[in-house]
């Protein structure tokens, strides 16, 4: 029988949680982060950096709490983009077979299972470069079905036009994911079918529609340390910065151009998590792809550095992820709670109670 978090969570006084609150954005940080300033943080002695990150984290978030989100590929493969890390590109021979958009019943069944296992946010990914309006209409039906289960919803569908973002907002979408992937200076080494500015434009359309932003990047694609600093600076300088910041460690999939990239030094990955926490104190910093290759000790350091969200479930789109039992056991060993918790700053509660 599969364990759930309720099996291992210590009893605590009930805290009323309101799932759906009016959309608001966190206040932008005073000033901007230069790449040099971010690099100086990354270069701090490791223990000093973790101490600073944990101090910032405790100023803004309850200690020991982690958001559980589940990610489902609702339309797999056949993408015309050439992102060098992605096994869903039609340009690469990775063994991924293109599949049509899942039905409402299929998605509802998956979302209900995720909710029953402890997830509070359900993310739906579709391998499109840019969805057509008829696709947006169908995804709207999926959003409504998932929200009917009492879960927060997130979608990642590719580039959006302003009217499409408005339609998703009208369907009840809470979050939209659109990653920057890396620093602008390194971006063309990773993908050539979409401009960096197009990513920024989609983020603007999402923000203007009143949808919360989920935006992060990938570490381990052959980038230099300065490019990691550049990515964090780009994210932190978005006005306002994203409510959710997923940090991925490259999963090297055979058949993709980046399959032979050198592995990321685990402590370097922890450093990126720590600097994301310091520069974006009220964001959910999410451990995303690559957790399966980290091990418990590295994940524990990431939580210490300020990560407070994970993708929960045995698959992320088409790549592996630790199974639910493994995550339940890890959180229990660390004395952490996988539950819905808000930022300790009252004006930010509506964004950070996923």
From Swiss-Prot:
Enzyme nomenclature, EC number: 2.8.1.6
CDD domains, per database record: Radical_SAM
Binding site for [2Fe-2S] cluster: 123, 154, 214, 286
Highest rank taxon of the organism: Bacteria
Molecular functions (GO terms): 2 iron, 2 sulfur cluster binding; 4 iron, 4 sulfur cluster binding; biotin synthase activity; iron ion binding
Biological pathway: Cofactor biosynthesis; biotin biosynthesis; biotin from 7,8-diaminononanoate: step 2/2
Needed cofactors: [4Fe-4S] cluster; [2Fe-2S] cluster
Biological processes annotated in GO: biotin biosynthetic process
Keyword terms of this UniProt record: 2Fe-2S, 4Fe-4S, Biotin biosynthesis, Iron, Iron-sulfur, Metal-binding, S-adenosyl-L-methionine, Transferase
PANTHER family per UniProt: BIOTIN SYNTHASE, BIOTIN SYNTHASE, MITOCHONDRIAL
Family: Belongs to the radical SAM superfamily. Biotin synthase family.
Purpose: Catalyzes the conversion of dethiobiotin (DTB) to biotin by the insertion of a sulfur atom into dethiobiotin via a radical-based mechanism.
Protein name according to UniProt: Biotin synthase
Protein species of origin: Paracidovorax citrulli (strain AAC00-1) (Acidovorax citrulli)
Lineage: Bacteria, Pseudomonadati, Pseudomonadota, Betaproteobacteria, Burkholderiales
Gene: bioB
